[in-house]
Amino acid sequence: MSEAVWHDGEDVVLRLYIQPKASRDKIVGLHGEELKIAITAPPVDGKANAHLTKFLAKQFKVAKGLVHIEKGELGRHKQIRIESPVQIPTEIKAII
């Protein structure tokens, strides 16, 4: 099991490194002991967090309210909990 992604009961917990202002939204892959995700939103006024939440909700096929930022609200390093995901993206399945 990876340090970047693990199961906690029915939930999935992700340790992320976020790259804001990227050319497109993408799960890049492992970045040290974290999962790197590139997002197009700038890191201003919570826009990157809102965009990240929406992107992850779409990837895991859950409502945005089921994606929680547990740590790192104001930084690039974050810990995210996804409650009872319907699907696990292929890029993440490969490292679990």
UniProtKB/Swiss-Prot annotation:
SUPFAM superfamilies: YggU-like (SSF69786)
Gene Ontology terms: cellular component: cytoplasm
InterPro entries reported in the protein's UniProt record: DUF167 (IPR003746), YggU-like_sf (IPR036591)
Pfam families: DUF167
SMART domains: DUF167 (SM01152)
UniProt-listed NCBIfam families: DUF167 family protein (TIGR00251), PRK05090.1 (NF003466)
Record-stated family: Belongs to the UPF0235 family.
Highest taxon above the source species: Bacteria
Protein name: UPF0235 protein VIBHAR_03581
